[in-house]
């Protein structure tokens, strides 16, 4: 192997060592980062509707669905007898339209079940 080739191989080896390792459970996104990545373009935290596309997600813990005054919920969600528990919120995030037909929320879940669980637990703790 020539000297220039050895130098190139050395540079490549150094670059490969500098690449980040695959994410482990310790490096998983925090729930607030998951919220920022998949929820915040349509939803805010808090309890007052700020005219975003979706209703605010603060104070969800055991709150009935469609409970934010002034928000134009779909008829389906408005008439559903849903309370936001951990199980209900996880089912909603994992498959919104499978959970309730004719909802106005258009969302394709891109989270793993573990990420969904962390996000749901965190959302239920937000005021």
Functional labels for PLM-detected ranges:
Residues 85-127:
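C-terminal capping alpha-helices of c-type cytochrome domains
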Residues 60, 64-67, 96-100:
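A short secondary-structure junction motif
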Residues 1-11:
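Bacterial N-terminal signal peptides that target proteins for export
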Residues 9-19:
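Bacterial N-terminal signal peptides
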Residues 26-49, 57:
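Sequence/structural segment immediately N-terminal to covalent heme-attachment motifs in c-type
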Residues 21-25:
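Sec/Tat signal peptide C-region and signal peptidase I cleavage site
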């Amino acid at each position: 192997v020539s000297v220039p080739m050895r130098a190139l191989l050395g540079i490549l080896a150094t670059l490969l060592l500098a690449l980040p390792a695959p994410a482990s459970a310790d490096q998983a996104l925090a729930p607030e980062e998951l919220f920022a990545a998949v929820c915040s373009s349509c939803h805010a935290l808090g309890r007052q509707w700020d005219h975003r596309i979706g209703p605010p997600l603060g104070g969800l813990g055991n709150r009935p669905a469609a409970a934010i005054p002034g928000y134009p919920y779909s008829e389906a969600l408005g008439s559903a007898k849903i309370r936001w528990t951990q199980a209900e919120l996880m089912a909603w995030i994992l498959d919104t339209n499978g959970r309730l037909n004719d909802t106005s929320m258009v969302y394709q879940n891109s989270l793993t079940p573990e990420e969904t669980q962390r996000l749901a637990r965190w959302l239920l703790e937000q005021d």
